[in-house]
Regions:
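Structured nucleic-acid-interacting core domains from mobile-element enzymes and related host factors
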Residues: 14-23
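Short conserved beta-strand segments at catalytic cores or DNA/RNA-binding microdomains
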Residues: 16, 27-29, 33-51, 66
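Short helix-terminating capping/connector loops at secondary-structure junctions
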Residues: 76-81, 107-109
Length: 206
């Protein structure tokens, strides 16, 4: 098959053909226009979200992070965690083949699909989790003075925040149950005790 369509209808068909598939949603969170931004990766089943600081909102920066995750996790675990990725039609996600494939065997590492235009609700789980990021980094905030260590800290607090949909477990706990703490460590995640969680801008005040 020389060409595979990647629209939302194709995504739904893929899920129908692979009902046990775990879904990953991918998006960007923008700081000030023209400045640093985030790539967010949301594991829908466990509500765990990863976030990576990028100097610019480019396709190359997204591919670089996907390649890094592939290297850190190894091909087998990467493909287990990322069987299918749903994202939007932003220009930063405009090179699906580079996201889907690696240079070594097995070359195919994931399947990427796109939401319909102007339909962010189709990846609503990711959008809802962004609201927690915006509690710490309000809209209009500059990300230019932040480091990746700051972003890891922010996501540790968000991923340790217990959710009703997870039966009052945190995303960290839910993800650990399915995949183990070793994988979380490889992803740069650490737990935060409930009484120490801060979901306010002061968390990242220098």
């Amino acid at each position: 098959m020389l060409f595979r369509s990647r629209n939302y209808a194709d995504f739904q068909k893929y899920l129908g053909d692979h009902p046990e598939t775990t879904i990953v949603q991918m998006d960007s969170v923008i700081g000030r226009v023209g400045g640093k931004c985030l790539l967010t990766i949301h594991f829908v089943e466990t509500s765990l979200m990863l976030a990576f600081l990028r100097d610019a909102n480019t396709s190359a920066s997204v591919i670089r992070i996907i390649n890094l995750l592939d290297k850190v996790l190894g091909p087998k675990m990467f493909s287990r965690l990322f069987p299918v990725i749903l994202t939007d039609n932003g220009s930063e996600f405009s090179n699906p083949k580079e996201i889907e494939r690696r240079d070594i065997v097995p070359c195919k590492r994931t399947n990427i699909f796109y939401c319909d235009p102007s339909a962010p609700y189709q990846k609503g789980a990711c959008e809802v989790n962004h609201e927690l990021i915006r509690r710490i980094l309000p809209k209009g905030s500059s990300f230019d003075d932040l480091t990746q260590e700051d972003i890891f800290l922010m996501m540790d607090h968000i991923n340790s925040y217990k959710r009703k949909k997870l039966n009052d477990r945190s995303p960290y706990e839910a993800f650990s149950f399915y995949y183990g703490e070793d994988v979380l460590k490889k992803l740069g995640c650490s737990p935060v005790a409930a009484e120490n969680i801060i979901l306010k801008p002061k968390l990242l005040k220098k």
